[in-house]
Swiss-Prot record:
It comes from the Archaea. It is an enzyme of class 6 (ligase). It catalyses: tRNA(Trp) + L-tryptophan + ATP = L-tryptophyl-tRNA(Trp) + AMP + diphosphate + H(+). HAMAP family: Trp_tRNA_synth_A. GO terms for biological process: tryptophanyl-tRNA aminoacylation. The lineage of its organism: Archaea, Methanobacteriati, Methanobacteriota, Thermococci, Thermococcales. It is found in: Cytoplasm. Its main location: cytoplasm. Belongs to the class-I aminoacyl-tRNA synthetase family. This is Tryptophan--tRNA ligase. It comes from Thermococcus onnurineus (strain NA1). Its EC number is 6.1.1.2.
Length: 384
């Protein structure tokens, strides 16, 4: 197995997810936990759980226990608005929507326009505010409940700073440095930022569940060190794998490599061009050789995208897998199938994105949960 690297800022190599569970000290998302989820929600699990796109967790078992006992829980996730969103960014939001809908819980979505300004030297504050609005449209298009979802932008929801101050008092520099690798060159705003990122985990006196990619896990380790000293729960998390870019299974889809990504605003022609030109397949050198030896779907980005999100039907996915292995299916056929699936998804998403322009105010300011948060006092435990 080649070496791989996973940090909150960078993912390189072909990730060994079992090894990553050991390195990060998380727990595998077991059959028992998924069966319990299906039982409590009285629902069939979505493909991102069935196919183990979400594979790891911290205290998800306790979240389910809290729900079953009547204590409940709440959801928290976010988006750093440094540019347009792509397929890899949006899939965890669909999993979050399923959890909100099936468990009937509140959801807080933090838009970290301040963080991206601090961490990205080339971005102005106006840039991150612009992308915040654009990204919010994509997030609303997923279909969250507007009265149980609060989307807040750090630069606007300044109450979060008042909550972050006592949190920052719990974190010394050596703790932050150990988790985030800060150096003498790190901006002082970057060093303080983990306190702001932790603040939403204290929005309710319940356990917080964060659905996110595994590379974001370090942000919540610090919270778990001090949460109980403030009279709150350690935050829980469920972790997803990475959506690979078009050019290979190593690393993850990246906005810094536009040819590897399908953006949520791409038009049908661009989708077709990118997938046809750049998508790595598990095919052989010639069609004749592929018919004789069969393809290698386990090495194929096209198959991986279908597995992660674009083929809902488990039976059809396995039929495609075996047809490829048996040499009955050629790469061009699979690429055309994926192109059609992605185009259909984006057509619907872009329609909902346009409709979202009229819903921004409700999610940020006037919905039931939004109004409650704007009006609510800072919890006593977080007043220092």
């Amino acid at each position: 197995m080649d070496e791989f690297k996973v940090t909150p800022w960078d993912v390189e190599g072909l990730v060994d997810y079992n090894k990553l569970i050991e390195e990060f000290g998380t727990s595998p998302l077991t059959d028992e936990l998924l069966e319990k989820t299906a039982q409590l929600t009285k629902s069939e699990l979505p493909l991102y759980f069935r196919r183990r796109f979400f594979f790891s967790h911290r205290d998800y078992d306790k979240v389910l226990q809290d729900y079953e006992s009547g204590k409940g829980f709440f959801l928290y996730t976010g988006r750093g608005p440094s540019g347009p969103m792509h397929i890899g960014h949006i899939i965890p939001f669909f999993a979050t929507k399923w959890l909100q809908e099936k468990f009937g819980v509140n959801l807080y979505i933090q838009i970290t326009d301040d963080e991206k300004f601090l961490f990205k030297d080339k971005l102005t504050f106006e840039d991150t505010k612009y992308w915040a609005y654009q990204n919010i449209l994509d997030i609303i298009a997923v279909g969250f409940d507007p009265d149980r979802t609060f989307i807040f932008q750090d630069s606007e929801f300044t109450k979060i700073y008042e909550m972050a101050i006592p949190i920052a008092k719990k974190i010394n520099f050596s703790m932050a440095k150990a988790v985030f690798g800060f150096t003498e060159q790190s901006k002082i705003g970057m060093i303080f930022y983990p306190a702001i990122q932790a603040a939403p985990t204290f929005f309710e006196k319940k356990r917080c569940l964060i659905p996110a990619a595994i590379d974001q896990d370090p942000y919540w380790r610090l919270q778990r060190d001090f949460a109980e000293s403030l009279g709150y729960y350690k935050t829980a998390a469920i972790h997803s794998k990475f959506v690979p870019g078009l050019m290979g299974l190593e690393g993850k889809m990246s906005a810094s490599k536009p040819e590897t990504a399908i953006y949520l605003t791409d038009d049908p022609e661009e989708v077709g061009r990118k997938i046809w030109k750049y998508a790595l397949t598990g095919g052989r050198a010639t069609a004749k050789e592929q018919r004789e030896k069969g393809g290698e779907p386990e090495k194929c980005v096209v198959f991986k995208w279908l597995e992660i999100f674009f083929e809902e039907d488990d039976k059809k996915l396995m039929e495609r897998y075996h047809a490829c292995k048996n040499g009955e299916l050629l790469c061009g056929q699979c690429k055309r199938y994926l192109i059609k699936k992605v185009q259909e998804f984006l057509k619907e998403h872009q329609k909902k994105r346009k409709e979202a322009e009229k819903k921004v105010e409700k999610f940020k300011y006037t919905g039931e949960l939004a109004r409650e948060q704007w009006d609510k006092a800072v919890p006593e435990a977080l007043k220092g």
